[in-house]
């Protein structure tokens, strides 16, 4: 066996290289895709092995995939990102073409005009200039021109709005202005003469008199307390002879009380809603007959009524107000009556001519209180717009603008010295203004709640009385404006106050339906 295997192996000989045939590389034959072949076959209408039903079954089974030729869309967020990149390149291209001023102040002005912060933390002029360039590349250079045009238009509109408009008044107004001028000038001369005489008094004498006054004021006590009505009492006012006190109530009633025993004398019936104020005629109980008009009152329904002392019914009604009348006040002459209204105006009525001679606007909100100068030449008004105005009745001009309160002005009063004005406001303060300096000279942090009324002592103005919603009334020195006495005793808000013409009595009325008289011991 071994010998036979060896012999067989030996008999196999290796073929020479030239006899081996070379390997031929066969070319690839491309028959096309089945999908294209199938499309061609279907286009020619050939049925072949697969019919329409077989083709449909193959497509449904997923064995045959025939595309519709639609292009595969890129995802939405990828396309948005590409758009943002292109937009950023365009913005940078625009930014390079924008010319920005190298003046830093002008750059800041442009940023302010565009409503952007003029500077950022750690930003220098170069960075600020580049920031302006980037902003303009986004909003466009026309935006800066547009803001400048808008600013010019707003300036023009403000200038037009601030223009003073004059309306032609009736001839009766001209007659009244001349009459007031002739009435006030002699009184002003008399007041100045009295001031000169008072200045000639030695300083020691004046100081001792002031000390005595302060001592008596510190000894003020509640002399009488009376329940005045079933509803809150909104206003109180002494008669010129200090023998009577008039009160106004939210029930619509007005009442007259004897002083100092506080007995009810008359009940005046005529108003149907809250009465805002009732005031005595300047000559009532002094030289005026009881049958004449002695009192005037106003109410929230816009009614203003005139009263005599011998009747419980109103003598006359003043018509013309369509909204709430907050206050009424007599001119020192007694011929004119001033009313403040919630239609942003105040009015002056000539009772002798029985007509409205002045309808004065000037406040942006309702006018709440009015006061007349002792001479009769000026009128002061306080409004719910937190501003006060001083008007010259002889010319009709606003001679002083009282700006400084943060909230509504509810009380205003002139000092007998002729140049001080006090205003009480909803910001809990009382401000003292000087007509000569045309500014606020002192701010009294008077109360812990809104101040409802202010009143100077009517003879020399030696002290100032304030009342507020903190249930108290306070007395302040004049000048100096230091606190002297706090009149505490009411259980509700102090809504009104007054000082008798002789300076001996103080009256306060409250939301607790009572009024109180205060007198020195």
UniProtKB/Swiss-Prot annotation:
It holds the Pfam family PRP4. It is found in: Nucleus; Nucleus speckle. Its main location: nucleus. Keywords: Acetylation, mRNA processing, mRNA splicing, Nucleus, Repeat, Spliceosome, WD repeat. PROSITE patterns: WD_REPEATS_1 (PS00678), WD_REPEATS_2 (PS50082), WD_REPEATS_REGION (PS50294). One of its GO terms (cellular component) is nuclear speck. SMART domains: SFM (SM00500), WD40 (SM00320). SUPFAM superfamilies: PRP4-like, WD40 repeat-like. One of its GO terms (biological process) is mRNA splicing, via spliceosome. InterPro entries: G-protein_beta_WD-40_rep (IPR020472), PRP4-like (IPR014906), PRP4-like_sf (IPR036285), WD40/YVTN_repeat-like_dom_sf (IPR015943), WD40_repeat_CS (IPR019775), WD40_repeat_dom_sf (IPR036322), WD40_rpt (IPR001680). It comes from the Eukaryota. GO terms for molecular function: U4 snRNA binding; U6 snRNA binding. WD repeats lie at residues 228-267, 270-317, 320-359, 362-401, 404-443, 446-486, 489-521. Component of the precatalytic spliceosome (spliceosome B complex). Component of the U4/U6-U5 tri-snRNP complex, a building block of the precatalytic spliceosome (spliceosome B complex). The U4/U6-U5 tri-snRNP complex is composed of the U4, U6 and U5 snRNAs and at least PRPF3, PRPF4, PRPF6, PRPF8, PRPF31, SNRNP200, TXNL4A, SNRNP40, SNRPB, SNRPD1, SNRPD2, SNRPD3, SNRPE, SNRPF, SNRPG, DDX23, CD2BP2, PPIH, SNU13, EFTUD2, SART1 and USP39, plus LSM2, LSM3, LSM4, LSM5, LSM6, LSM7 and LSM8. Interacts directly with PRPF18, PPIH and PRPF3. This is U4/U6 small nuclear ribonucleoprotein Prp4. It comes from Pongo abelii (Sumatran orangutan). The gene is PRPF4.
């Amino acid at each position: 066996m071994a010998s036979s295997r060896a012999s067989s192996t030996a008999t196999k000989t290796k073929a020479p290289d030239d006899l081996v045939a070379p390997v031929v590389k066969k070319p690839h034959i491309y028959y096309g895709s089945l999908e294209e072949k199938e499309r061609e076959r279907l286009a020619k209408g050939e049925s072949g092995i697969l019919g329409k039903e077989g083709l449909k079954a193959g497509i449904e089974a997923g064995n045959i995939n025939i595309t519709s030729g639609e292009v595969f869309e890129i995802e939405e967020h990828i396309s948005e990102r590409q758009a943002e990149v292109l937009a950023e390149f365009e913005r940078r291209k625009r930014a390079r073409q924008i010319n920005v001023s190298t003046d830093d102040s002008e750059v800041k002005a442009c940023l302010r005009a565009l409503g952007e912060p003029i500077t950022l933390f750690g930003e220098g002029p170069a960075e600020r200039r580049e920031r302006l360039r980037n902003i303009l590349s986004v909003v466009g250079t026309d935006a800066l021109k547009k803001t400048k045009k808008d600013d010019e238009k707003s300036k023009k509109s403000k200038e037009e709005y601030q223009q003073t408009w004059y309306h032609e008044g009736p001839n009766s107004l001209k007659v009244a202005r001349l009459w007031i001028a002739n009435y006030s000038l002699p009184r002003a001369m008399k007041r100045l003469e009295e001031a000169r005489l008072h200045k000639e008094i030695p300083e020691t004498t004046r100081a001792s008199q002031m000390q005595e006054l302060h001592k008596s004021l510190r000894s003020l006590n509640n002399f009488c307390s009376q329940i005045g009505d079933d509803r809150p009492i909104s206003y109180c006012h002494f008669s010129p002879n200090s023998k009577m006190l008039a009160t106004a109530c939210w029930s619509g009633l007005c009442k007259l009380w004897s002083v100092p025993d506080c007995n009810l004398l008359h009940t005046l019936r005529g108003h149907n809603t809250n009465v805002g104020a009732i005031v005595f005629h300047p000559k009532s109980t002094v030289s005026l007959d009881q049958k004449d008009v002695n009192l005037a009152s106003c109410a929230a329904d816009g009614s203003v009524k005139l009263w005599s002392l011998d009747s419980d019914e109103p003598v006359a009604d003043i018509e013309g107000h369509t909204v709430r009348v907050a206050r009424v006040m007599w001119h020192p002459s007694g011929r004119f009556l001033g009313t403040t209204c919630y239609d942003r105006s105040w009015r002056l009525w000539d009772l002798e001519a029985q007509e409205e001679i002045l309808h004065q606007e000037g406040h942006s909100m309702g006018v709440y209180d009015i006061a007349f100068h002792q001479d009769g030449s000026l009128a002061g008004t306080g409004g719910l717009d937190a501003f006060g105005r001083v008007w010259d009745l002889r010319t009709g001009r606003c001679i002083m603008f009282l700006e400084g309160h943060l909230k509504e002005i509810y009380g205003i009063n002139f000092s007998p010295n002729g140049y001080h004005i006090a205003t009480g406001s909803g910001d809990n303060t009382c401000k003292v203004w000087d007509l000569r300096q045309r500014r606020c000279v002192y701010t009294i942090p008077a109360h812990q709640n809104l101040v409802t009324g202010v009143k100077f002592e009517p003879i020399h103005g030696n002290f100032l009385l304030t009342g507020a919603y903190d249930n108290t009334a306070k007395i302040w020195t004049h000048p100096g404006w230091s606190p002297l006495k706090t009149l505490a005793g009411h259980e509700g808000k102090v809504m009104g106050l007054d000082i008798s013409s002789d300076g001996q009595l103080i009256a306060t009325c409250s939301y607790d339906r009572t009024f109180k008289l205060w007198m020195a011991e």
